[in-house]
Amino acid sequence: FATLSGVGCSDDYNAPAVTRSDFEMRYPTATHVEWEKKKGYGVAEFILDGRECEAWYTKSGEWVMTRFEIRYNELPDAVRVAFEQSYGTQTPIDDIERLERNDNTTIYYIQAETVVDGFPSEINLEYSSDGTLLRNTVDVEYFDYWDDYLL
């Protein structure tokens, strides 16, 4: 849950009955369910099949999206091929997620490690199911090297 935690977040949200009912219908085997309020949405953080997930709902109880933690081999072939053509097969991967949205689209998110200008960095890639790169952001981890001058 590191990608969204702490931003506009309120713990211990009491989701309306309509929201809870929809959630239980969609994910009857979910465990460790915790409700929070994030950015104005009701969010259920839960475990499904041993993996972390989040389901997002509007104030009126309408399901908006669900984020699922997945494994590399669960990515569609087109997404794996696109990633490997751009970053190779040896790029260390930190996180992979599938995002199902209420407009019937699915987005695949890959967070991987790379080096930019000699600095360790994270690349955040979002792909459509057909392997089209939708968004690419880079977080360069610049370090403070003042300690190099300590005696």
Q: Where are these predicted regions, by residue range?
A:
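Long, charged/polar, surface-exposed segments that mediate recognition or autoinhibition
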Residues: 62-95
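A short acidic/small-residue loop/turn micro-motif
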Residues: 70-72, 140-143
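Short, structured motif recognition centered on aromatic/hydrophobic residues
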Residues: 23, 44, 83
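Glycine- and aromatic-enriched low-complexity segments, predominantly in secreted/extracellular proteins
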Residues: 11, 141-151
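Amphipathic N-proximal alpha-helical interface segments
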Residues: 41-68, 110-139
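Bacterial Sec-dependent N-terminal signal peptides
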Residues: 2-27
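A cross-family detector of function-defining hotspots
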Residues: 32-50, 92-114
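A broad structural signal for alpha-helix termini and local helix breaks/kinks
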Residues: 27-28, 87
